[in-house]
Regions:
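Active-site-adjacent betaalpha module
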Residues: 1-126
Length: 126
């Protein structure tokens, strides 16, 4: 689905990395498992991570779940994350919107906060 150098992994024109940005290429569902992100964040003294992206039920939830035992407070940007319809082995389809809501509910119920981007931008900077 996300093959290196494929069409699905290119940056959107309005979201191209700037020279000062760090781009990490992960090989696992969670960004923490296959990169040095934890070391980088700890070096910077980061205590809270805001997670957004694709797919809510997989990569977003995986990163959030892995961040908590590493000592981070997790906030999910609900309107900056999304997922896709999935078809189970028995042929039953799970709608993307229902899956997105369920993933956010699980995160909020167990290990993180879920907020809109508007609410996140109003958080105090530390």
């Amino acid at each position: 689905m996300f093959a290196a150098d494929g069409d699905t992994v290119s940056f959107e024109p309005g979201m191209l990395p700037r020279p000062q940005d760090t781009v990490l290429r992960k090989q696992t569902v969670s960004v923490f498992a296959s990169t040095d992100l934890d070391r980088r964040l700890k070096t910077l003294g980061v205590k809270t991570v805001i997670v957004a992206g694709l797919m809510t039920h997989a990569c977003v939830a995986g990163a959030a779940r892995d961040a908590v035992p590493l000592g981070y407070h997790v906030v999910i940007a609900s309107d900056a994350s999304a997922t896709r319809d999935i078809v189970r082995a028995d042929g039953q389809k799970v709608d993307k919107d229902a899956l997105h809501r369920a993933a956010l509910a699980e995160i909020e119920d167990t290990f993180g906060d879920v907020m809109t981007t508007a609410d996140i931008t109003r958080l105090p900077l530390r």
